[in-house]
């Protein structure tokens, strides 16, 4: 999907959701349509279809920017964890999609710049959560290292280096060694960097 088309689709979706939210009697909470859209976008980030991740990612960024009260970063990350669970019975391509989905969800949260709007304590907790998640995914598959590094650099630009380093060290110590050296899907992984470029 071409970038211009993704942006157009995201803008159109946001417009519809703004109308639905304004007509709903759910002040401060997501209306039914908005809640459904959140679930659909997050789950869509694990889609194996070409261009789907970029499209869903662009829409999720705009949704997070547009609905700061109705859509929390915590709820998005929780949806990610619930809908993209890794299981031992998964085949290689399915696990690959789940891992890419988790990385792309983190990317959307970071690109929305929502972290900068939070108070220091909750922001630190969320940054640590994001760093842990990204390090976990990078440790599972080597073909995610390039994409994950780009996203971590974006996060670094939003936080004082000393704070982020401390969080990364804590996350690394807690994660432990669990690297999977299987490079399946490595060729396709490079193109996905577009979402965070």
Language model features with spans:
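Eukaryotic alpha-helical solenoid repeat scaffolds
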Residues: 1-11, 16-29, 35-197
């Amino acid at each position: 999907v071409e970038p211009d088309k993704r942006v157009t689709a995201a803008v159109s979706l946001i417009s519809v959701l703004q109308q639905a939210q304004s007509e709903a009697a759910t002040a401060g909470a997501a209306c039914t349509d908005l809640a459904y859209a959140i679930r659909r976008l997050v789950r869509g980030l694990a889609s194996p279809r070409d261009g789907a991740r970029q499209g869903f990612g662009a829409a999720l960024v705009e949704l997070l920017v547009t609905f700061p009260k109705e859509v929390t970063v915590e709820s998005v990350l929780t949806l990610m964890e619930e809908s993209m669970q890794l299981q031992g019975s998964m085949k290689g391509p399915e696990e690959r999609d789940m891992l890419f989905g988790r990385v792309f969800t983190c990317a959307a949260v970071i690109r929305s710049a929502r972290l900068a709007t939070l108070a220091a304590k909750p922001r630190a907790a969320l940054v640590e959560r994001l760093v842990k998640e990204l390090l976990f995914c990078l440790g599972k598959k080597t073909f995610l290292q390039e994409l994950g590094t780009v996203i971590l650099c974006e996060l670094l630009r939003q936080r004082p280096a000393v704070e982020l380093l401390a969080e990364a060290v804590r996350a690394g110590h807690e994660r432990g060694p669990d690297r999977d050296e299987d490079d399946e899907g490595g060729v396709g992984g490079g193109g996905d960097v577009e979402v965070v470029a």
